[in-house]
Design a protein with these regions (language model features):
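Active-site loop/oxyanion-hole signature of alpha/beta-hydrolase fold enzymes
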Residues: 5, 48, 54-98, 102, ...
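Conserved HGGG/HGGXW glycine-rich cap/lid loop of the alpha/beta-hydrolase fold
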Residues: 13-63
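Flexible "cap/lid" loop of the alpha/beta hydrolase fold
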Residues: 108, 112, 119-153
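Conserved loop-alpha-helix segment in the C-terminal half of the alpha/beta-hydrolase fold
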Residues: 218-259
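N-terminal cap/lid segment of alpha/beta-hydrolase-fold proteins
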Residues: 1-9
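Catalytic histidine-centered segment of alpha/beta-hydrolase-like enzymes
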Residues: 256-268, 272
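Short beta-to-alpha linker loops that shape the active-site pocket of alpha/beta-hydrolase fold enzymes
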Residues: 42, 57-60, 67, 127, ...
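Alpha/beta-hydrolase
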Residues: 156-232
Length: 285
């Protein structure tokens, strides 16, 4: 657990260590209602490629502390910056920071506000999300994107659903998805992120406008969007990525097609190889 000075202790999971690594360290940030372990497949590949890796449970998620407030983009980004400052003293200096979906928006905000802490950022099917373009009114967004009530679902049923919905995912992806839930003594699940906090995170994402800060970002940004029927806002995604290509000063795009929104869980080896290549070809220099 790391408290980076914001008063909330965040759980970290590590693979490899800086002393034995050859290449840039990596810090991995999950999406809304997800958790650090959904990165496990990619983290194992990163470590095998010579990177020291840390994945973080953001506030309210996984095994991190769960305050009742502080789920706006600024506060969550401050949490991550505080963790990076602690990690820097432990040998993880200026990592490449990857974030998925909501986490993609978080790392873009991080690159804007704290460029001195990162070598660059990777936005995985995120970093371009501007929910107000799709839902001008918050109430409309809150209804449309309200999560399903999974409380009380048997563990076995949930795992069976995951395996059926994602037949091409490796075991690390299924296990990581199951880690979104606390497993109760009666054999049922409870999401680590409560509905109330979920909606607070969603409100913070709805308020965030990453395109307004693109031109001011001074570190490299890699966008890794997913293309497919299950992608987020597939109809406007290419337009959003084109906007990023024309606005972010140092930018690269690596499309995964076809791919799920959680492409890092679905294709962990390929994802790790794409990011690793950018750490050795000079993009993240």
């Amino acid at each position: 657990m790391i408290d980076g000075g914001t008063g909330v202790a965040l759980r970290t999971v590590r693979w490899g260590n800086p002393e034995d690594s050859t290449f840039a360290p990596l810090v991995l940030i999950h999406g809304l209602a997800s958790n650090a372990m959904l990165w496990e497949g990619a983290a194992l590949e990163f470590a095998a490629l010579g990177h020291a890796v840390v994945a973080v449970d953001l506030r309210g998620h996984g095994l991190s502390e769960k305050p009742d407030t502080g789920y706006d983009m600024q506060t969550v980004t401050n949490d991550v910056a505080g963790v990076l400052q602690v990690l820097a003293a432990q040998g993880y200096e200026r990592p490449v920071v990857a974030g998925q979906s909501w986490g993609g928006n978080v790392v873009v905000e991080l690159a804007h506000l704290f460029p001195e802490l990162v070598r660059g950022v990777v936005a995985v099917d995120g970093g371009f999300l501007e929910l107000q373009e799709h839902f001008p009114q918050w109430d409309e967004c809150a209804v449309a994107l309200r999560p399903p009530n999974l409380l009380g679902t048997p563990v076995s049923r949930m795992r069976g659903y995951m395996e059926g919905a994602h037949p091409d995912w490796p075991k690390t992806g299924i296990d990581g998805s199951m880690a979104n839930f606390e497993q109760l003594p009666d054999g049922t699940i409870r999401p680590w992120l409560t509905l109330e906090r979920h909606l607070m995170v969603l409100r913070g994402l709805w308020e965030h406008k990453p395109t307004h800060i693109y031109k001011d970002i001074t570190v490299p940004v890699m966008f890794v969007p997913a293309e497919g029927p299950s992608g987020v806002f597939s109809d406007t995604k290419r337009q959003a990525i084109e906007r990023a290509l024309h606005s972010v000063p140092k930018v690269r795009v690596e499309w995964f097609s076809p791919a799920d929104h959680d492409l890092h869980a679905q294709h962990p080896v390929r994802f790790a190889q794409v990011v690793h290549a950018a750490t050795i070809d000079g993009f993240f220099s």
